[in-house]
């Protein structure tokens, strides 16, 4: 299937202040957006794709000045793909607090003339959804045919169906969870601690020092990658294979240099991430993950939290995902069924762990394709 081709982001400016869940207010902010496909005359074929931790508005296609800059879900979104841009108008939004052009810690604080840094307020999934709703308003979209996301993106999709029930026809929630477990919060805390303890962090104001806390970011990403892969996947990819510069395959160096293939992989991923991502953004987004818990206001009762939803749902999980295990998706399914909502659920037997939602698995893509075929028939796309 062909790619959507060359795409270009656009920056949307919002003068009306946005009050955050914390009570802080962000004024005169901007959000970077990409769109794919055409909005029909009835404005009924719009789909919002919500991004996960380190992704962005750049969902599909490539940039003219960088043909290697393929969108993070290019295998899912495009002409003839499961989310077919010949039929749907797809929007990707870079969330507040991110580091890819939307207002965030790297932006200039108008009150000081300097980057916000650590002074940028903590944001939540709910704050992002409110900001995304303003994007929908700007496009004249009263109701999305679907809101879709994987992992943290799935949390946003679920939040949309809770916060704007009349504006979401279908919620597609993949490899996600209704709240983080204590173990997941612990992983995030270790990652944040690595960043906060980096001497180059400078209390979050490292921009003024001309440095980045790369060591902390590197470790944070390495921790994350361990949780994104399954044990079986890591065993198949790396096993206990050694990586030796001299070509020796069965001898140890008896040092603390990189010796195992899995060590090399983690360091490579950490180095790559530290080059392009912002540490303050990492702190913000992991805290937003921690805080997401729509049942909290209902004494932990997820069924009560979902009582006012109106959307139809597709919930999908992956058998080897231990970051957000299938049992967490089934919690959502049960709560929706308790409310007599229309729910489709699939647990896909895939070996790749949490990252499976990003990969080109035929069974998974066929599931999404079939569901969008149903939506297309409903909206005449």
Swiss-Prot record:
UniProt: substrate binding residues: 221, 355
Keyword Cytoplasm: yes
Keyword Membrane applies: no
Site feature (Important for acyl-CoA specificity) residues: 323
Gene Ontology MF, one: homoserine O-succinyltransferase activity
Family statement: Belongs to the AB hydrolase superfamily. MetX family.
Name of the protein: Homoserine O-succinyltransferase
Organism annotation: Burkholderia multivorans (strain ATCC 17616 / 249)
